[in-house]
């Protein structure tokens, strides 16, 4: 069983993540984690914090000489701005005179609409929002990206590779039916301002971000995560909480600012008749092929072995530069919300975080299915499982070719 946990605050000394259940022999280095965190800082429309935020990584345990040892893996991400915050965010009590007059210590009594501020104050009994926003901040996702590297390395040993990309920023969207990126396209995606695979759409997205910045607005969008090389049978239909799509949806909805998730064609499927909503199968070249992949690689809560496709919709960042109307809870008077440093558009970063969360869920499901205390044992178990599938049930991730589709139409005619 793979379990993960994060700790730390946005302006605390460090963020810490622990992932347990990692088999021995997984390749993992500090450089791999640093590279992933650098990808999280990418994207047109990011705020000033990305310019000076340097993620100093230390692997604290579970790894020796670049290989996991079978124990929990602990990763620390130090906060380079800690010297400015060490009194305000100190774990131990601080003399009030030391904090007196510090702007960073001023009570945040004007909760920001769309953030956790007001409800967090109600729930935990705080009289200001600082304790809420420090933990609720999307800065915490840096730790999940770091832990996602561990999961991605587990999946890589099984031949599963992930890629994320931006499909929409506000109303600017990649055209329906546009080519999908593959893992080999990651460098090109990371070089694109919005991590968009369509150059023309990317240029329009940049223009939309510029217009929003000028207007004092923020923008949301949609990201998609793809997983190639999936084995069939990850997840289960026997209980709701073991369904792979249920777990993926929960993990993605747990990312700050994500408001919707769809698998495969998702909500578009609801607009189609049943005959055009599902993936028919046929036999060709010695295996079963699906004619399409509208399901996005998941049927009945289990991976099909086809390309896994899942999307997440991100709302516009709630810290709007021109500040939204709120109430000052200290005075009860109308006010403008506190404006913390923020981005115009963080959709590209959301894709990297979504990729990490999908990796964690898929790695967890793979370890549940195949088991193994080492990578070698895990791979052997996977190979044994696949070899045990009867030939009549073996599927191919390749979609049926046009000739096979024509043959299927003939079969349809015969059956009717």
Swiss-Prot record:
Its EC number is 4.2.3.5. Reduced FMN (FMNH(2)). It catalyses: 5-O-(1-carboxyvinyl)-3-phosphoshikimate = chorismate + phosphate. Keywords: Amino-acid biosynthesis, Aromatic amino acid biosynthesis, FAD, Flavoprotein, FMN, Lyase, NADP. NADP(+) binds at residues 40, 46. SUPFAM superfamilies: Chorismate synthase, AroC. It comes from the Bacteria. Its cofactor is FMNH2. GO terms for cellular component: cytosol. InterPro entries: Chorismate_synth, Chorismate_synth_AroC_sf, Chorismate_synthase_CS. GO terms for molecular function: chorismate synthase activity; FMN binding. Pathway: Metabolic intermediate biosynthesis; chorismate biosynthesis; chorismate from D-erythrose 4-phosphate and phosphoenolpyruvate: step 7/7. One of its GO terms (biological process) is amino acid biosynthetic process. FMN binds at residues 135-137, 256-257, 300, 315-319, 341. Belongs to the chorismate synthase family. HAMAP family: Chorismate_synth. This reaction introduces a second double bond into the aromatic ring system. Homotetramer. This is Chorismate synthase. It comes from Kocuria rhizophila (strain ATCC 9341 / DSM 348 / NBRC 103217 / DC2201).
């Amino acid at each position: 069983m793979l379990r993960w946990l994060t700790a730390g605050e946005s302006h605390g000394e460090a963020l810490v993540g622990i992932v347990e259940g990692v088999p021995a022999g997984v390749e993992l280095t500090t450089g791999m984690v640093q590279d992933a965190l650098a990808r999280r800082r990418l994207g047109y429309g990011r705020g000033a914090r990305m310019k000076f935020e340097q993620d100093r990584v230390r692997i604290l345990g579970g790894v020796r000489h670049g290989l996991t040892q079978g124990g929990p893996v602990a990763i620390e991400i130090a906060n380079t701005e800690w010297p400015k915050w060490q009194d305000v965010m100190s774990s131990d009590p601080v003399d009030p005179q030391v904090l007196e007059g510090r702007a960073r210590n001023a009570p945040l009594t004007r909760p920001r609409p769309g953030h956790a501020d007001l409800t967090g104050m109600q729930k935990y009994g705080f009289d200001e929002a600082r304790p809420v926003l420090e933990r609720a901040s999307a800065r915490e996702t840096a730790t999940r990206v770091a832990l996602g590297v561990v999961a991605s390395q587990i999946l890589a040993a099984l031949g599963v590779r992930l890629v994320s990309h931006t499909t929409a920023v506000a109303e600017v969207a990649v055209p329906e039916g546009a080519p999908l990126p593959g893992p080999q396209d990651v460098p090109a995606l990371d070089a694109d301002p919005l991590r968009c695979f369509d150059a023309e759409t990317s240029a329009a997205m940049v223009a939309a971000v510029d217009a929003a910045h000028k207007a004092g607005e923020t923008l949301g969008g949609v990201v998609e995560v793809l997983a190639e090389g999936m084995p069939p049978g990850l997840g289960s239909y026997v209980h709701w909480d073991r369904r792979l799509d249920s777990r993926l949806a929960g993990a993605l909805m747990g990312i700050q600012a994500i408001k919707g998730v769809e698998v495969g064609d998702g909500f578009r499927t609801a607009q189609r008749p049943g005959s055009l909503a599902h993936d028919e199968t046929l036999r060709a070249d010695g295996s079963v092929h699906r004619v399409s992949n509208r399901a996005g690689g998941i049927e009945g809560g289990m991976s099909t072995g086809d390309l896994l496709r899942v999307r997440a919709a991100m709302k516009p960042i709630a810290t709007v530069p021109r500040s939204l109307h709120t109430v000052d809870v200290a005075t009860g008077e109308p006010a403008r919300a506190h404006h913390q440093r923020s981005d115009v558009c963080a959709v590209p970063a959301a894709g990297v975080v979504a990729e990490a969360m999908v990796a964690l869920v898929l790695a967890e499901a793979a370890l549940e299915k195949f088991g193994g205390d080492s990578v070698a044992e895990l791979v052997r178990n996977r190979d044994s499982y696949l070899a045990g599938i009867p030939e009549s049930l073996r599927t191919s991730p390749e979609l049926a070719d046009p000739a096979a589709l024509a043959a299927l139409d003939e079969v349809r005619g015969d059956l009717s």
